[in-house]
């Protein structure tokens, strides 16, 4: 009897261990589409890009892009549009949740760079934007990037790259990192920091959400070109070539049929000019 009980306990332990191990393996977007259910990561606090509303619905450009992509993949594979579960994915956690198999794909202002591309695959890019500053409208001492190089306090989000680029260029900046963009905006409102930096797409969304309180300052180099180019991609499991190509096909279709521009106009409104369609599958800009 005791042997039988021990055998049952051992079998259960093995099953639990196998399940736990399986949960840490990357997912396949294509397989999940075929199964009828996908888990998509995005931001919950970015006006115009990724927002979770009080009624728990999701809105924003990245939300619409991700939805179009998975539905297009389903159409191409002859299956029904999948049920979508949304998951909040802050900048600092994105590579981890992909590698652990917690999401199928992330669409969340996910700039493609060499460091991230070592850990995950990227579909796209689907959008090109640039870095900018958000300042208080009543602070007239900050009119350009160079004005920060006087011991001013600059806020950005942990796991995001823009502030590090500014710090490298302007050593006099005092860099402060917060866990979310909304926390950065609140710190700026309370005058705990002097400016916030990230992509122009994100900053214009916050400026619209708080009319009259903030303004966006463009960041340029001495030659007048943007301080950075930010290419947004769709993150997924490393080496998942099938899903990556399926995403790229969907992005091309989205741009060709006019859906992408319609999404941009709808979600970014008068600030639609801060983005342009990017070339899916072209990662030549990624440098070590």
PLM regions: where:
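C-terminal motif of bacterial Sec signal peptides marking the signal peptidase cleavage site
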Residues: 16-20
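Ligand-binding clefts/hinges and TM-proximal coupling segments of bilobed small-molecule sensing domains
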Residues: 23, 162-175, 215-218, 246-288
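Extracytoplasmic small-molecule ligand-binding "clamshell" domains
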Residues: 28-105
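Periplasmic-binding protein-like
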Residues: 44, 127-135, 208-248, 270-288
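Bilobed "Venus flytrap"/periplasmic-binding protein-like clamshell domains
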Residues: 45-47, 58-75, 131-186, 200-202
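Acidic, polar ligand-binding/catalytic clefts
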Residues: 79-147
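A ligand-binding cleft/hinge motif common to bilobed small-molecule-binding domains
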Residues: 92-93, 108-119, 165-168, 194-228
